[in-house]
């Protein structure tokens, strides 16, 4: 049975097990996996961009970090390499399975939940940072939730879709303002 045949019939979580035997990198795996539009997924594949995003937290190493939507852990790996105390929240169970198998250092810190329903005050009673490659369909809601906790979140960093950035930065009466 060829690898292509196996990949066709396996879930993404099962595919990650094949990595060990077939030497498939996460980047190659992401080419095989289709992002789920219903979850607003878009996988971060560019390692240089991921590292630049992780570098935005260099002044906050003493604070815990919450990564939203880690997917296959491209940004996660840089945050861990830089020594951050990291917790991740991921709604997609296949991505959760992948993270659990490939990032054992995150045991107990992978939350298989919806970020928008998390009680951030309970999870982080003190200050913490938020970072991510934000799902496009809830980017605005993520920022509104972060604003609700602004006393606890000194830094929120990440990548968003250009159109979302234009809406968030638009002044009153601008053509980019959300209706």
Predicted regions and their residues:
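Intrinsically disordered, low-complexity segments enriched in serine/proline and basic residues
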Residues: 6-7
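Catalytic cores of RNA-modifying enzymes
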Residues: 14-179
